[in-house]
């Protein structure tokens, strides 16, 4: 039995791992799917004071409260920022880091700072400009969800994803991640690329880490929300790490 902590991405909640978590539990694993402050069932806690640090502490608190060790820590999309921060602080408790079509930051990076590295200039500028405009004009500091259609989520689950995603604090994307270097102690890292949608910033990270010591890069033929599109296949891949 392995201990899995599945960390969701922007606008989502722990709900997005429903089917993957069920498959892992059926196989006998312990699975936690924490929801970040300000989204999902915790949307009532949203506000401009919610930052990347808030979400890192959410996951740290979950692991510490459940007294978990030897954790396989999975982060989807924006969740890659979160799990990197978590691993930096409690690396001895982490067996593996899994970046699920996710950002892989280094010291000082914010998500907004990573977009120009991972996308063509005109595309990254459009993303960043659109995010700021929506946050300022519509919901005062909250970034609006990107529709599931643009992430090529499987058609019969798009409505489910769209109705459950909620705006997220812009500050979570703008806060630089400050690292002390502790995460380097985690020796097993996996990058899972969702190879069925574009324009994807995550091809940049898959290419960057492919072939590097300690990294395994695999591709899934689906849209960005791998845990929604291919939940059982994802569970099988994750279970193999246990």
From Swiss-Prot:
<dbReference type="InterPro" id="IPR029058">
    <property type="entry name" value="AB_hydrolase_fold"/>
</dbReference>
<dbReference type="Pfam" id="PF12697">
    <property type="entry name" value="Abhydrolase_6"/>
</dbReference>
<keyword id="KW-0964">Secreted</keyword>
<dbReference type="GO" id="GO:0005576">
    <property type="term" value="C:extracellular region"/>
</dbReference>
<protein>
    <recommendedName>
        <fullName>Carbendazim hydrolyzing esterase</fullName>
        <ecNumber>3.1.1.122</ecNumber>
    </recommendedName>
</protein>
<keyword id="KW-0378">Hydrolase</keyword>
<dbReference type="InterPro" id="IPR052897">
    <property type="entry name" value="Sec-Metab_Biosynth_Hydrolase"/>
</dbReference>
<comment type="function">
    <text>Catalyzes the hydrolysis of the fungicide carbendazim (methyl-1H-benzimidazol-2-ylcarbamate or MBC) to 2-aminobenzimidazole (2-AB). Following hydrolysis of the carbamate ester, the carbamate decarboxylates spontaneously. Can hydrolyze model carboxylesters such as methyl salicylate, alpha-naphthyl acetate and p-nitrophenyl acetate. In addition, shows substantial hydrolytic activity in vitro against widespread pollutants with carboxylester, carbamate and amide linkages, such as dimethyl phthalate, propanil and chlorpropham.</text>
</comment>
<dbReference type="GO" id="GO:0016787">
    <property type="term" value="F:hydrolase activity"/>
</dbReference>
<comment type="similarity">
    <text>Belongs to the AB hydrolase superfamily.</text>
</comment>
<dbReference type="InterPro" id="IPR000073">
    <property type="entry name" value="AB_hydrolase_1"/>
</dbReference>
<feature type="active site" description="Acyl-ester intermediate">
    <location>
        <position position="77"/>
    </location>
</feature>
């Amino acid at each position: 039995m392995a201990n899995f902590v599945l960390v969701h991405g922007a606008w989502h909640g722990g709900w997005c791992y429903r089917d993957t978590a069920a498959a892992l539990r059926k196989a006998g694993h312990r699975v936690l799917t924490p929801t970040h402050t300000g989204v999902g069932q915790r949307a009532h806690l949203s506000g401009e004071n919610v930052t990347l640090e808030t979400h890192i502490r959410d996951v740290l608190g979950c692991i510490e409260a459940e007294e978990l060790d030897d954790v396989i820590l999975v982060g989807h999309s924006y969740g890659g920022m979160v799990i990197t921060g978590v691993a930096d602080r409690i690396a001895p408790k982490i067996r593996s880091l899994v970046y699920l079509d996710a950002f892989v930051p280094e010291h000082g990076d914010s998500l907004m700072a990573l977009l120009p590295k991972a996308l063509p200039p005109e595309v990254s500028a459009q993303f960043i400009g659109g995010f700021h405009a929506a946050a300022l004009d519509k919901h005062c500091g909250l970034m609006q969800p990107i529709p599931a259609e643009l992430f090529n989520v499987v058609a019969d689950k798009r409505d489910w994803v769209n109705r459950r995603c909620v705006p997220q604090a812009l500050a979570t994307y703008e806060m630089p991640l400050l690292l002390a270097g502790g995460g380097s102690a985690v020796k097993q890292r996996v990058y899972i690329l969702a190879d069925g949608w574009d324009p994807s910033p995550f091809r940049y990270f898959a290419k960057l880490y492919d072939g590097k010591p300690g990294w395994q890069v695999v591709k899934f033929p689906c849209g960005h929300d791998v845990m929604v599109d291919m939940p059982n296949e994802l569970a099988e891949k994750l279970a193999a790490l246990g």
